[in-house]
């Protein structure tokens, strides 16, 4: 399944240009509900270096109009950090980029997954130049109303080890690779 060309106009940052946009590609390597083990923890595949470009583009994509979020010059003079403020769910960009295409946490990309709940806690704003490492922990796995739920906790630390944010992400997932294949090939 090719990514529609109309999405290309939204691809502006260097990270976006290299981000795999078609989640149907490589789904065979994604972790499934059956594969996931509660308590399993590990680092994401990639780190994420925070840039003004990343924050500005995400804020604009969210429809923000506050000059503290979309006008770098205004933010330099008026923001408490002297930098653009981030949209509260900017952390999801870090997660999707960092998780990569194989290993723990990749179930977040699974074709057919549904997102019934998420909770994000911002401990302190990300700053330009910070190198963010994401640690993924499978925190819960259960069946409710006949549907397989999986929850992971993502902790985002900067290069100094300071915890910057936490994201509890829950998805209803296809249980097995065969279930994912039925959805992906439909």
Annotate each predicted stretch with a short phrase.
Residues 1-34, 122-186:
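HotDog/MaoC-like acyl-thioester-processing domains
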């Amino acid at each position: 399944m090719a990514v529609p060309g109309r999405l290309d106009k939204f691809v502006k940052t260097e990270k976006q240009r290299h981000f795999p946009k078609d989640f149907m590609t490589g789904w065979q390597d994604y972790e499934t509900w059956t594969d996931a083990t509660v308590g399993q923890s590990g680092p994401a595949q990639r780190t994420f270096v925070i840039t003004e470009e990343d924050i500005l583009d995400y804020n604009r994509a969210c429809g923000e109009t506050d000059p503290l979020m979309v006008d770098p010059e205004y933010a330099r003079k008026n923001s408490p950090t002297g930098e653009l403020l981030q949209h509260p769910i900017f952390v999801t960009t870090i997660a999707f980029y960092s998780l990569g295409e194989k290993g723990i946490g990749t179930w977040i990309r699974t074709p057919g997954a549904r997102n019934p709940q998420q909770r994000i806690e911002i401990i302190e704003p990300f700053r330009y130049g910070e190198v963010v490492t994401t640690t993924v922990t499978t925190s819960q796995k259960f069946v409710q109303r006949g549907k397989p739920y999986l929850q992971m906790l993502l902790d985002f630390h900067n290069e100094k080890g300071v915890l910057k944010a936490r994201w509890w992400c829950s998805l209803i997932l296809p249980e097995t690779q065969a279930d994912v294949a039925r959805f992906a090939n439909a």
